[in-house]
Amino acid sequence: LAGLPGRYNSYVGIQKEQKDSIDMLVLGDSESMTSISPMELWKSVGITSYICGQSGQRISESYYMLKHALDYQSPQVVLLETNMLSRYTNTPDSLRSSISDTAMYYFPVLQYHNLWKNIVNDQIPEGWQSYKGFAIRPGVAPYSKGSYMKKTKKEKEIPQINLWYLDKIRKLC
């Protein structure tokens, strides 16, 4: 949605789609919105999809984005990009972010105060372009310099708050 600040695109965009027209919703951080092309999915296999991800999306944001999207869509598949599971530890800042995300869901005026006229009046912002949540990045090329990941036996626990939201997402699905 050109003309909207980045974090608002998916929130407003999903409600502009025809009701129950999306087969697959994608949630996650920037990898979700730059790696999966709804136009290519439609062209190659006939699946309608919408990317509800955003840069640095926290799992709590994914949960509330999914809740919002399900008010407008009944997808057959929800794809969850999992980078966010290992991010944010069990710290006061993480808890504060979670509380903030909850407040913004139940009181959207807190986060979307600049968009209230478009949302209430069901107006499409000037300059609107729909790429179904996909972020077009010209000049991006695949990495071709060999393996960049090292095999290790180290394990990292997923923070409890992230597991809690993951379970809430599972239950919503």
Regions found by a protein language model. Give the residues of each.
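Conserved phosphate-coordination/catalytic loops
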Residues: 2-6, 60, 156-164
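Short, compositionally biased "basic patch" segments
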Residues: 1-6, 35, 138-140
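Alpha-helical scaffolding within the catalytic cores
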Residues: 9-12, 34, 64-67, 164-169
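N-terminal secretory targeting modules
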Residues: 1-23
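Second-shell loop/turn segments in exported
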Residues: 26, 51-55, 152-160
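Secreted/periplasmic serine-hydrolase-like ester/acetyl group-modifying domain
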Residues: 93-172
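Hydrophobic helix-cap positions at the C-terminus of alpha-helices
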Residues: 69, 172-173
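Membrane-embedded segments
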Residues: 27, 31-113
